[in-house]
């Protein structure tokens, strides 16, 4: 089992293309580290790889493989991840949470309104300045942060998609939590039509 996003998207794709639960269960999903997926695919160790983002773009640019589907093809634009803080941390440090969230929100919007080449150049500067011996080669494939909402605003849909899937595949009997109880946009300066200062 792959777990997480890759497992859910694979299952959704198979089900939406006519496979029943019995057939889906016959698909052997293997967890392979993302950095090893392309090599495993090219060496024939696996038949299909759930390549995402830069890993996918790099593999496609090298040729010899093709994209079968993207989660966007059947889910549309959505944000698949989020930052989380513990409730007690938020209560003790609301200004810190607001500053962090504002910084992330502004960075998301800056990357959307700035020419791609400039964003990549800035990322390269940051990468180099960190001094961690990280190569910037993969940055040439960067497109976006994969965040749907303005400034990273979250919606119920980002959570309901997955809770519905968990119910459909029998991992839970009923959805007992409301998506709205899982997140807040309270600290995001773009909430309610706002803009950051």
Protein language model regions, located:
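Short, mixed-charge aromatic SLiMs
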Residues: 31-37, 129-130, 186-191
